[in-house]
Regions:
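Positively charged n-region of N-terminal signal peptides that target proteins for export
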Residues: 1-4
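Bacterial N-terminal signal peptides
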Residues: 7-17
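Generic structural motif
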Residues: 19, 35, 56-58, 96-98, ...
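Intrinsically disordered, low-complexity
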Residues: 22-66, 160, 165
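Exported/periplasmic cell-wall-interacting domains
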Residues: 23-26, 67, 80-165
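Structural motif
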Residues: 36-38, 75, 114
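Short, surface-exposed secondary-structure junctions/capping segments
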Residues: 61-78
């Protein structure tokens, strides 16, 4: 009887250990450094993974108005995921904030929107990491399709996003 209890306990502990090992640690924050063309996923202040990224085709300076092709700067969250994106998979960044909207209003324009972290459209997927040779998006943050698949698993809706110059 005692042997059976020990065996059962060992099986349960091993099973829990394997389950814990299989579940990836999820990010609680994303930090995008525009000047370095990098995006880091963090958990508890520790870097889980860093990716090289392509940005808006006018990468210097914060996004101010719709159509300026700039990637925004500031604090946002991931507020939605799109498994049917034309860019393979995408995570929506909560731009524009109330401050972004007010700034655009003062400039007599709209702030724009649809800022995402995304992969590559099907016709360009073959480029893989070569897509990073130039900044080409309308203001989004682009990674390879393999990378967005990994990011998709690690980043839940509600994750904080900090975009720095």
């Amino acid at each position: 009887m005692r042997t059976r209890s020990i065996q059962l306990t060992a099986v349960l502990i091993l099973g829990l250990h394997r389950a814990a090992m299989a579940a990836p640690v999820q990010a609680d924050k994303i930090v995008i450094l525009k000047s370095a063309h990098s995006m880091s996923l963090l958990n508890g202040g520790k870097t889980l993974k860093t990716y090289k990224v392509a940005l808006g085709s006018v990468p210097v300076g914060p996004k101010r108005v719709e159509g300026d092709h700039k990637t925004p700067e500031g604090d946002y969250i991931i507020d939605a995921k799109n498994a049917h994106s034309q860019f393979h998979l995408s995570l929506h960044i909560s731009y524009p904030s109330a401050a972004d909207q007010e700034r655009a209003r003062r400039l007599g324009s709209r702030p724009g929107g649809a800022i995402m972290i995304h992969g590559l459209a099907a016709p360009f997927a073959y480029l893989g990491p070569l897509h990073r040779q130039t900044d080409w998006t309308d203001g989004c943050v682009a990674v390879t399709n393999a990378e967005i698949e990994e990011i998709w698993k690690l980043v839940p809706v509600g994750t904080k996003v900090e975009i720095r110059p």
